[in-house]
From Swiss-Prot:
Belongs to the MdcC family. GO terms for molecular function: acyl carrier activity. It holds the Pfam family ACP. GO terms for cellular component: cytoplasm. Subunit of malonate decarboxylase, it is an acyl carrier protein to which acetyl and malonyl thioester residues are bound via a 2'-(5''-phosphoribosyl)-3'-dephospho-CoA prosthetic group and turn over during the catalytic mechanism. Signal peptide: none annotated. This is Malonate decarboxylase acyl carrier protein. It is found in: Cytoplasm. Its main location: cytoplasm. Keywords: Cytoplasm, Phosphoprotein. The modification O-(phosphoribosyl dephospho-coenzyme A)serine is found at residue 28. Coiled coil: none annotated. It comes from Xanthomonas axonopodis pv. citri (strain 306).
Length: 105
């Protein structure tokens, strides 16, 4: 297992909604995403536990894209990954954010 941690400067808070949201499932080719509202001095933190070692540059690219589209303040995202593709990672991140902000996933 490899642990990765990223931190992004936030520009806006997540819309009103739940305090946390959990989407996905930890299974082969998939991942679980937990999003929580926490005081982080205006930052967004993303912690990843993955079975796929050596893909830090790909994770960085996917998360840079997500953070550019959603520069959220005071949000922690925890990802438990079992080899999901970048497209699945992006999908689950969007789903988790939708649930957190009160939309149906």
């Amino acid at each position: 297992m490899e642990t990765l941690r990223y931190r992004f400067d936030g520009q806006r808070g997540a819309r009103a909604g739940l305090e946390h949201a959990l989407v996905g499932v930890v299974a082969s080719g998939n991942l679980e995403v937990l999003v929580e509202r926490v005081p982080l001095e205006g930052a967004m933190e993303i912690d990843i536990l993955t079975a796929a070692r050596g893909f830090g540059a790909i994770w960085q690219a996917v998360l840079d894209d997500f953070a550019a589209r959603h520069p959220l303040r005071d949000v922690r995202i925890s990802i438990n990954d079992v080899g999901a593709t970048p497209a699945v990672v992006s999908l689950r991140l969007e789903q988790a954010l939708d649930v957190l902000q009160g939309a149906d996933a």
